Amino acid sequence: MSFPVTENIAKSQRHISFYLACGMPEATPIIFLHGWPELSVSWRHQLPTFGNLGFRALAPDMRGYGRSSIYTRHQDYALEQVVGDMIELLDAIGVERAIWVGHDWGSPVVWSIAQHHPERCHGVVSLCVPYIPEGFAPETIIPLSDRKTYPEDRFPAAQWDYQLFYRDNFVAASAGFESNVRATIRALFRAGDPKGKGKPARTAFIRASRGWFGEANTAPDVPVIRRY
């Protein structure tokens, strides 16, 4: 028997989570949390694979993404709030524990679930981001930077410069991405250049450039050169 991927909504008094699901409702849940800038559909290949292996595979749009609740205040995106969303999602599907899989910005969320709600975990998997006990924040990750690639005098925040830009320019950063959503997606998801391997990442220049797209604060209209 093959299980389809379905669209679902979990509502509480504080939040709405849209999520995709595949598999038997009574099976052990494995919940996939995406990073930035992604959506639940980023897990479109994993959901049917694990759903048809005997798990109940789920992938939510995280807070602020897609069809889940979107908030305008910076503090509404604190890890405490995002973790609360995931615990409510677990309650909504009527289970006590899940296997949590996080990628990129989803990784700090799954680690925080394990730290603060171990009773809601069968296991935790982190892709791309290691476990950092002190928390995934600029103050803890900047000191771990590779200073051969990012000399401190030129790149004080290393590849994490973009995080400081977001923190200090939340409204402007949001406006820049929203000014032309289609162009933003094309710009951020265009294919990388192999010549950039081993060189400072674009994320290290965001404050100096006054944003991802410079002073214009809107994405250029780049062509689509690859489709997935």
What do these predicted ranges mean?
Residues 3-5, 17, 67-97, 101, ...:
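Flexible "cap/lid" subdomain of the alpha/beta-hydrolase fold that forms the substrate-access gate
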Residues 6-12:
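Short acidic-hydrophobic surface loop/beta-edge motif
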Residues 9, 45, 179:
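Short, well-structured alpha-helical interface segments that form or flank functional binding sites
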Residues 12-22:
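A short loop-to-beta-strand scaffold at the N-terminal edge of the catalytic core in hydrolase folds
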